[in-house]
Amino acid sequence: MKLPIIAVIGRPNVGKSTLVNRIAGDQQAIVHDQPGITRDRTYRPGFWQDRNFQIVDTGGIVFDDHEEFLPLIREQAAIALAEAAVALFVVDGQAGLNAADQEIADWLRQQNVPVVLAVNKCESLEQGYTQAAEFWELGMEEPFPISAIHGSGTGDLLDKVIEYLPTITDVEEDTTINVAIIGRPNVGKSSLLNALTGEQRAIVSPISGTTRDAIDTIIERNGQQYRLIDTAGIRRKKNVDYGAEFFSINRAFKAIRRADVVLFVIDVLDGVTEQDLKLAGRIIDEGRAVIIVANKWDAVEKDTYTINQYRKELQARLFFMEWAEMLFISAQTGQRVNKILDLVDQAAESHRRRVSTAVINEVIQEAVSWHSPPTSRQGKQGRIYYGTQVRSQPPTISLFVNDPKRFNDSYRRYIEKQFRQDLGFAGTPIRLVWRGKRVRDAERGTPNRATKV
């Protein structure tokens, strides 16, 4: 069941993201003293007085500045209000009431949503009520003095906010598939997000680095929900300034860890760059399922053999991801975008799958019968006693052997290939853990001696 939404609204640098982090209980929205850090709308789960909800952090609203992003930020805020049960209007108690606050208040009155006014940066109780008093002029009913940094006043504020939330009696088990959209700056991640959602969800601009936060949106298809996480483009370290962009890149890496499946977006015109390779390595290290999305295919001059040529070139560079599905798309025109979620379903199922020990050992027996383990120069042959899956996400199989050193890389790749081929693992890494075990211990630990190989 969809949770009710609280939209956080206000001008830049009044502490909206700090308040969202306070309510959500951890630091995920980027907090920095530079105005305009949050550009897109960012969804976070929240809980208060036995009530579950989502809280949406939006970009700072400005009406008298005509920079490129500002109309887009207002559009994102308007979309957040359209789906919200209540708006949380944040102002700066230290700066006091100003014309920008009044403009936002007038704009909010035009929206069909109740508003609760939070006067932030009130660091003491006595001063807080004095600072909040002048905001009665906005005509937004009672202003609540709070300190988002220290948490004072936020309890009373939330008590008021949840009065506007609809009651949810049943919350279904979360079977949502988390999908992180990852790639270098300006490869088309936000355009892909918009193509998947069918709306202008993230700010799209030809300027590299438009998206700063890892932002979430939920879509549903055939009863399956997907949480799409668009992230800041990841640059080379020497091109990263300490500050907002540094935090965004760390947030993107955290988004990879949150994901079940990563859409690894590559600019097909650039091919696989060194930064792409490093990013691919990070995805592999985190053990995420992957779909390689080769974007901007509409800009390539093609003939009958073009796609095969490009596929071979990309696979040669990403040889360590040979198990990942590769899709050539155009986020701009929508070409093949409709195939992405089918591949996501397949990869997520493989990533979460658990296989019985009996089946794993059948695969091992078959593999060994076709290709025996290598023999050392001293005439000692490797031997696999049995295997068992010890975890999923990614599938991890422990193989108990007489001596791990007797199994070279070639044979290990062969065994992994057999698991993929026989068990149908697609789009996910498989981790094989080779463990040494004495014969007697192996026989004692084998779940079924008939499966020994």
Swiss-Prot record:
Specify the superkingdom.
Bacteria
Which segments constitute the KH-like domain?
353-438
Keyword Transcription tagged:
no
Q: Which annotated residues bind GTP 2?
A: 183-190, 230-234, 295-298
For the keyword Protein biosynthesis, the answer is no
The entry's GTP 1-binding residues are: 10-17, 57-61, 120-123
Query: What are the BP-aspect GO terms?
Result: ribosome biogenesis
Q: Which InterPro entries match?
A: G_ENGA, GTP-bd, GTPase_Der, KH_dom-like, KH_dom-like_a/b, P-loop_NTPase, Small_GTP-bd
Q: Name one Pfam family in it.
A: KH_dom-like
Q: Which UniProt keywords apply?
A: GTP-binding, Nucleotide-binding, Repeat, Ribosome biogenesis
Q: Which PROSITE patterns match?
A: G_ENGA
- What GO molecular function terms would the record report? GTP binding; ribosome binding
- What positions does the domain EngA-type G occupy? 4-169, 177-352
The record's note on quaternary structure and interaction partners says: Associates with the 50S ribosomal subunit.
Role played = GTPase that plays an essential role in the late steps of ribosome biogenesis.
Q: Per the similarity annotation, which family is this?
A: Belongs to the TRAFAC class TrmE-Era-EngA-EngB-Septin-like GTPase superfamily. EngA (Der) GTPase family.
Q: Which HAMAP family match?
A: GTPase_Der (MF_00195)
The protein here is known as GTPase Der
